[in-house]
Every structure is written in C-alpha cells, then in structure tokens.
C-alpha cells in the first residue's frame, strides 16, 4: 500500500510518518512555531524539525542548522516538498 502525502498543514496532534532509516524519529518536516523577536512581538516562523517518537517531543533545527532544540509549542506542521 502506497502512502499518499499531501503538502497541507497538519495540527500537532497528527504525528508525521516514521523515518525509514531512523527508528525513533519522524521524517523531517516544516514546522510553524511562535517566536518572540527582540521587541517582544510574537510572530509565526517556519523552521525545519522532526518529532521524536519515543520521547513524544518536537525538535527544531537551529537557524544556522548546527544543533537541535526542544520545541515546546508547535502550531502546525507539513511535509517538506
């Protein structure tokens, strides 16, 4: 059975598909998360991340893509196109 992946935003309650090569990780996805700027204004930003299936937590990659950070609030996610 072939899985059909749509490029639509999903709620954080829906979990992305498991990565084929990594046992406890989902596929990398685009996340929509709230972020506060230097002036205290909260805005929605898009970041690349994944869901850890064993820890039941979202993680995002830092903006320079050198490290992973725990993400406590995810507004939505979608598969990378």
Please annotate each region the language model reported:
Residues 70-81:
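Short, structured beta-strand segments at or near domain termini in extracellular proteins/domains
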Residues 2-24:
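Surface-exposed ligand/attachment interfaces on beta-rich extracellular proteins
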Residues 16-19, 51, 78:
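Short stretches within intrinsically disordered, low-complexity N-terminal or propeptide regions
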Residues 29-63, 67-68:
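Acidic, low-complexity, intrinsically disordered interaction modules
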Residues 26-28, 74:
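Exposed beta-strand and adjacent loop surfaces of beta-rich binding modules
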